């Protein structure tokens, strides 16, 4: 028997209270950037029964209707009555937004006087980017499957295939892997877990049958399922009360779901509600582009990149690369290639990845993952052709 191991990733869908908060924070960011691309945004959201509050620091020339953004976002997700967990049109909306601290503003941007390469990081911190050749997206399979199951739950709820579904839900996938000299080879799906909110009318048997037919079958490739695959479908029994009525929600509570499903590493900084001067977001995006480009160019089968910053300082303090023993050339050579091909200064990341553009851009990232998505707005997913040093003749 070959040596294998199990690894698990989870996801939540857009009606989960924490994810609702992420989406509201990013909808606010989108609105600010659309009206004023130089907006400085640090927008947090929290929610509980019948209440949503947005709070934080925002400096923008835009005229932002925060309450409308909150209600529209909740409504689009499907929170249209107290039965489903929140009533977008009648819930309490509290707004407590202040301007960015002038101390931070002068240290970071003096943004009207400084050239882009002089803009300092908005805070200290360290961020990671990760890539692996186990899927076409160059993302971990356990994470990809958990995420796609969550997205599919929402799809069949909104298109009427499973009318008994309600917005809140969670998924989790355990994959059996083989380690091939540092590269990850998925062998099979060991366990699939789905807990979804539903209305009172549906039976547990109907839930299980519909989830297998309309959610699991279309998402998980047949080659990974066998007679030993375990399914836990709403294992707690009933899940009628959900959304903010079931649990309180908070922006930035789902950072592993947003990234790599427990693979790679995480510096701890959340993404949603933050403009691109916040390196928690822009640093993690460029680190993903670097790691993905290394794997896509077949310099390694698996790669992690770390970058770190000091507040007010444009140049990163450190850049680190590890290819888990899968590199075609030594890691120190790959590190050199990364440093020569990617500019980690926040002002330049923002320009190179076009991060000042709002619209529906960031709202899309706030559910179903920031990485491995096939969408032109996810500019950090574009593989950069790497210029390699030609050895001297």
UniProtKB/Swiss-Prot annotation:
Q: Which GO terms describe its cellular component?
A: cytoplasm
Would I find Manganese among this entry's keywords?
no
The molecular function GO annotations come to: ATP binding; metal ion binding; methionine adenosyltransferase activity
Query: Could you say which residues bind L-methionine here?
Result: 57, 100, 247, 278
Q: Which cofactors are named for this entry?
A: Mn(2+); Mg(2+); Co(2+); K(+)
Q: Where does Mg(2+) bind?
A: 10
- A Pfam family in this protein? S-AdoMet_synt_C
Q: Which Gene3D superfamilies match?
A: 3.30.300.10
Q: For this protein, what does the record note about how its cofactor is bound?
A: Binds 2 divalent ions per subunit. The metal ions interact primarily with the substrate. Can utilize magnesium, manganese or cobalt (in vitro). Binds 1 potassium ion per subunit. The potassium ion interacts primarily with the substrate.
Any keyword Metal-binding?
yes
PROSITE patterns, alphabetically? ADOMET_SYNTHASE_1 (PS00376), ADOMET_SYNTHASE_2 (PS00377)
Write out the residues that bind ATP: 16, 168-170, 236-239, 247, 253-254, 270, 274, 278
Query: In what pathway does it function?
Result: Amino-acid biosynthesis; S-adenosyl-L-methionine biosynthesis; S-adenosyl-L-methionine from L-methionine: step 1/1
Reaction equation(s) it catalyzes: L-methionine + ATP + H2O = S-adenosyl-L-methionine + phosphate + diphosphate
Q: State where K(+) binds.
A: 44
Q: What are the UniProt keywords, alphabetically?
A: ATP-binding, Cobalt, Cytoplasm, Magnesium, Metal-binding, Nucleotide-binding, One-carbon metabolism, Potassium, Transferase
The UniProt subunit note reads as follows: Homotetramer.
Database matches in PANTHER family: S-ADENOSYLMETHIONINE SYNTHETASE
Annotated family:
Belongs to the AdoMet synthase family.
What is this protein's record name? S-adenosylmethionine synthase
Q: Name the species this protein comes from.
A: Musa acuminata (Banana)
- Which gene name belongs to this protein? METK
